[in-house]
Structure formats: C-alpha cells, structure tokens
Design a protein with these regions (language model features):
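Non-catalytic cap/lid and distal C-terminal segments of serine-dependent acyl enzymes
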Residues: 23-31, 37-73, 77-390
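Bacterial Sec-dependent N-terminal signal peptides
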Residues: 1-24
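Short, intrinsically disordered low-complexity segments
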Residues: 3-4, 32-34
Length: 390
C-alpha cells in the first residue's frame, strides 16, 4: 500500500471515530436538534434542572438541600424532545450536591461539569451565590495545588499529600510561609478538603482580600493503611485487628496513633525540608473535621509544643486536665473548637469546651446551626483561617 493510500485510510478512520464520538454525545443528552439543554439554570429565586433521557420512564431529582438528602426526591416532567425538567425554589446561598434518579438508577447531570467527590461518590455541584459562598468560588489570584509523595517508615508506605501553596509562592524564592495542616474525616482522603471543602478557593479569596496571612496548607491522607486516594487504585495495606489478643502493646499503639505519629514526626519534617516554611510552633497550625478533628486533638495532646494553633471541627476526641495543662504551658495562641448544634458529636464538643474552660485555657467555642456536614466545615475554615498566624 503506497503512502497516499495509507494516509487516506488513516483520515477515514479518524473521521469515523469522530463521527461515532459525536453521535455518542448527541445521544447522551446534548439536546439533539432542539435547543441546547441547560442544567442547572438559576433564574431569580428558582433553579431548573434538566436531563435529556429519550428512553426513560421515570426521572427524579435528588438534592442535598432536601429534607431527606439521602432518600428524598422530586419527580421531573418529560417535555419536548424528551427533555425532563423540574423547577424548584432556589435554596439559601451554599454549595449543594445533587444527582438524577433515572428508572431507579442514580446518574450525574452531564450538562454540569462541576462535580465533587465524597469518598466513593461523584456528585454534581450547585453553587447558590450569596455572602455565604463568595469565598467558595474562584478568586482572581490563585494558588497552586500539588500532590507530593513522602516515605513513611512508621506506616511502611510511600504516601501522597495534597499541598496548597499561595499565590506568589513560585515568584518569591526568599519568602517563607506558615503552614496549616488540614485533616479530613472518616471516608475521606487527601483530596477531600480541595474537593468538598473548597479549601483552595477559600484560602485564595481570604488571602486576596487581605483577611488571611498567605500560608501553605498541607492535607494528608488520614487513613494509615492507604498510600493515596482510592481514585489512584493502589493496594491498601492489610492491618491486624486492634482487638486481637496476640497484638503487642507496640502494635496496638501503632494502630491507634500511627498516623498521628507519621503526621508529626514525618510529614511536618518533610514539609519543612522541601518547602519554604517558617519552622516554628507559632507558624504551625493544625485543624481537622470529625475523625480529623480527633487526630487534631490527639496530635495536640501527644505533641503539645508542636502547634500554636489548634482547631478541632466536629471532633471525635477529648483531652485530660493534664493534657490541657501541657498546652497552656506550651503557650498555645489559638484553640478554636467548632461544632453544629445538630451534630451527633455535639455532646463531645460540649464536654471538651467544659474541660478547656475548667482548666483555664483560653479558647473559642463556635457553635453553628446544622449537623455533620461540609456546609459547616467550609464555614469553619472560612472563619478560623483569618485568625491564624496573627
């Protein structure tokens, strides 16, 4: 076959592949020959969701703003060109997640490329504009999110971090920065805070407005048996059962506090070796939600002189009077405790607040509406970040 024929065959194959891809997209839900499908569409005090589903018999909308976000749904109506739609009242300003239920199967909105990953689920985002969400959208001056790896001898794994460096970090080679270690909750990983938590957008906006100090934010993977987020499909290390009577005290201690030890003895030194940071307690902060709040409390209990800023959020954990006394002696500059009044861990936060008060440790106890939700954790980050390193 001569070169002209070869090129002709290649061109034909490319055209066929392109046509097949275009046909696939057209069949999917881009509206065919009718007007383009727009979803979601905010108009005044309402928002309309649409899905082109030619062969569906029942289509419903499920959204996190509904009274029962894990089971509540609203019926959608089939319209022209098999486009299903429903118009609902616009919820109050916040970031919400939603999906469609097509003949009993949950599917994402293919018209909305804004998605968040919560553990193993990918969900569409609806950002309702307003004062609450003004720091949750892109700023004009944006930092950089990267994913370095560190070796953990304690956990026996090569592990992945998410690191945010503020706008201007690359162009100021002599400038050093304080560091916030920001920890996720159960079911999350090193990507949770930049996906569901909008940490990069929040820090970008606060720094751009002059409300927060430029800082580096380190977001580790809090699952001690994981190398990285499940999206990388890496093997998970098998761990012994904590209640196994054959375990030694050292093995049991590693199961309990191995990750916190790795955080304080390996991740902190790794960051201080590889990034331009101010390696002093007054330039280190630690915060975490739920399980990460427990890790925050444990880290501050075991290493009281390491962090001058401590922020447990919706936390599972406690501190003894002796541990609080050690924090006072170390000169903690900020202890920011936060929880929602409907959170299932609220009583634990109440108890910790009482202990801190009785032991005379100055602290802020921030109680918000609502429960164990990302809406609260974004609010907390947006609230305490301006208090750091001042």
């Amino acid at each position: 076959m001569n070169m002209k024929k070869i090129l002709s065959v290649i061109a034909t194959l490319c055209m066929v592949a392109g046509a097949l891809h275009a046909q696939e997209l057209a069949n999917f839900n881009f509206g065919g020959r009718g007007r383009p499908v727009v979803s979601p569409e905010i108009q005044g005090d309402s928002v309309t969701f649409r899905l082109k589903a030619d062969y569906a018999t029942i289509v419903k909308l499920s959204g996190s703003w509904m009274p029962n976000p894990y089971g509540g749904t609203i019926d959608m109506t089939r319209g022209e060109n098999n486009v299903w739609e429903v118009k609902v009242a616009l919820p109050s300003p916040e970031i919400y997640t939603y999906n469609f239920v097509v003949d009993g199967v949950s599917v994402n909105d293919p018209q909305n490329i804004q998605v968040q990953r919560d553990g193993t689920r990918f969900l569409n985002m609806l950002i309702v504009p307003g004062e609450r969400t003004e720091n949750y959208v892109e700023a004009n001056k944006r930092g950089t999110v990267s994913h370095p790896w560190y070796d953990s001898k304690i956990l026996g794994l090569n592990r992945r971090l998410t690191v945010y460096t503020p706008y201007g970090y690359e162009n100021n080679p002599k400038k050093k920065y304080p560091v916030l270690y920001l920890l996720h909750g159960a079911g999350g990983d090193e990507e949770a805070w930049v996906s569901m938590g909008r940490a990069a957008q929040i820090l970008d906006n606060l720094i751009e407005k002059g409300l927060a100090e430029p800082m580096i934010v380190v977001m580790p993977n809090g699952n001690g048996n994981q190398q990285a987020a499940g999206t990388l499909n890496l093997p998970v290390k098998q761990q012994p059962n904590y209640h196994d009577s054959n375990l030694s005290e050292a093995e049991r201690s590693l199961l309990m506090n191995g990750y916190v030890r790795s955080l304080c003895e390996e991740i902190v030194p790794f960051i201080e070796k590889n990034y331009r940071v101010i390696a002093k307690p007054e330039s280190r902060a630690i915060a975490g939600l739920s399980m990460g709040g427990g890790h925050t409390i444990t880290a501050s209990n075991l290493y009281p002189a390491l962090f001058d800023y401590i922020c447990p959020l919706s936390a599972a954990g406690s501190a003894t009077p002796e541990q609080v006394a050690a924090l006072k002696k170390a000169g903690v500059k900020l202890y920011f405790l936060a929880c929602g009044d409907a959170d299932f861990l609220f009583q634990g936060s109440e108890a910790l607040d009482k202990t801190l008060t009785e032991q005379g440790l100055d602290h802020i106890y921030f109680v918000s509406d609502g429960g164990h939700t990302w809406a609260n954790w974004r609010l907390y980050l947006n609230t305490f970040a301006p208090m750091l390193f001042k």
